Structures are given as structure tokens and as C-alpha cells.
Amino acid sequence: MIKLLYPEFWQKRNIIAYLLLPISVIYKFLGYLRASLARPIMLPAKVICVGNCSVGGTGKTQIVMYLAKLLKSRNVSFVIVTKAYGSNLKSATTIHQGHTALEVGDEGVILAKYGAVIATKNIKEIVPLLNELKPDIIIVDDFLQNPYFHKDFTIVSVDSQRLFGNGFLIPAGPLRQYPNKALDAADLIFLVSSHQDKIPNILTPYVNKLINAQIVPSNNIDKTKNYFAFSGIGNPERFFATLKNYGLNITGYKIFPDHYNYLQADLENLYSLAKEHNATLVTTRKDHVKFNDLNNNIVCLDVELSINHPDLLNEKIFKKA
């Protein structure tokens, strides 16, 4: 996992991007070698894989949450599999209420509120746990480039602002893989944070499987206060934009690397910054689960997915899955 901020050259090519291209060529070769040598296994239930082509937040977690609520409403049993980013997890584990973000990852702690979740760093380790849980559907979060298991249904999430960045592979660009192959193979494509009717040119060939989606607040926050925002997620700019669109007065902000594990010194610094700005701290749910915020000193903005074509999603999911 790349633990750094999204650099500017990932969005717009400059000399640094071109200097890093030789390493991107090696990355591409290693990915090809990995895929060619892989012997994918069949998991013991139908698999819905949610992923993206690039590094950084594209709304995958919100898509998984939406799917979990949808399956639950249809009384379909499911298990969510998450990668346990930023955790010290050693082997596949079924998440329970007492687990912390450091043990199983921030996404795992959040998703466990929606159903059974297995955290793992090795997809093959989940099979015994799946055999115990016996789900009808397995929702796999962020294993799109993993060639070691069969996928029955794939959803590719695309951020409407960043799209595919500068078009280069890691580390010269943000891409985990070139998008065309993933988009061709996808059953559905979610264009996230899109409030525009115009479809980006690169996605026009896929309009028949394209869903526009917005990340919208799902809880109430006092709009009369000042707020100092911070986050350690893949796309902090979208979080800050959501806060402003919600009508909050943001007096300052601080960005941490994706899946950042906060230290006590970080927390003390944040409280100091908030005091300087005469503001209350506000952050994301992914960040908030990492704090022992017993006194509710940090406001958390919860978000959910709103989509324009729920019928298309229902039709494709339940027809194929």
C-alpha cells in the first residue's frame, strides 16, 4: 500500500512523472507476471468484487455499504471481505465488535456495522471462514487487481474529478492498472461524486452500465459552529467539498496520508489548531474510528451513497449474482 498524499503530478504530468516511468514499466511487468502465474480459486459463493483502477478514494466503501443494505433488504445472506489496510493483521479474521482499526483496519470496523466482515491480507485464507459462515453472496472490497480468485460480478468505481489521473501506472501516476481492460470487463461502473449530466469521454462507450452516484451526508451536524477539518483518506478534497456543500463553516484543514494511524501527538496538535481557529474538529468516519473519543470532542460526518439508477443496479445484481 502506498502511504502518501496524492501528488500533483499524478493528476497532471510533469518531469517527476516522466522520471518515474521506468519504475512504472517494472510495475506493469510484475503485474503481468503475477497474473500469468496465478491459479484463481473458486470461493464457496457468488462473488461481487468492488474495486477501482487507481490509488486513492473513489467511494468503494460507500458502494459496499449500499450493496450490504440492498442485500439485507432482500434477505440475502452475505459476507464482506476487506483488505485490512493500515492494520497489523497477521491472518484472516472475522471481525467482532471489540476489534479496533489497528487490528483489522478502519474500513473493517465501519463495515462490520452492516453485516459479517472478514479482514484479510491474503484472499486464500478466507475460505475456511467462509465455509463456517455459509453466505449466499461474498462482497469483496478492493481486490479488483487480485488474480487469485474468480469474480462473478465486478463493479469499478471512478471518481468524477480525478478520473484516471495522468494516465500513468504507479508510481509515475495513480493507476493500479490501465482502465480500458477493467472497464470492458466490469458489469457496472460507478461514476462517484458526479453532479453533471455530461459523461467524461473515456466513459461514453460504457453508458449502458454506468451509474452516477453522489456521496451525501447521512447525519445532522450543527451548522452554527466553526469547524477545523482533518482526514487521512484517499480523497480528502472530496471530503472537504462535502463539508462545504453541506453548509459548514470550515476555518482550516489538515491532510494526513491515506489510512493514517494517528499518534497522541497528532491529536494534541489537532486540538491546538482547532483552538487557534476557535473551531470544533470534524473528520470522516474512517478517521473517527481510530480515536477513543469518549467525550465527543471530534465531530464525525457520516456519508452514504445516492445513485441515479437503482433499478439498473438491482436488475444487474440480482440477475447475475
UniProtKB/Swiss-Prot annotation:
It catalyses: a lipid A disaccharide + ATP = a lipid IVA + ADP + H(+). One of its GO terms (molecular function) is tetraacyldisaccharide 4'-kinase activity. GO terms for cellular component: plasma membrane. It comes from the Bacteria. NCBIfam families: lpxK (TIGR00682). Transfers the gamma-phosphate of ATP to the 4'-position of a tetraacyldisaccharide 1-phosphate intermediate (termed DS-1-P) to form tetraacyldisaccharide 1,4'-bis-phosphate (lipid IVA). Belongs to the LpxK family. This is Tetraacyldisaccharide 4'-kinase. It comes from Rickettsia conorii (strain ATCC VR-613 / Malish 7).
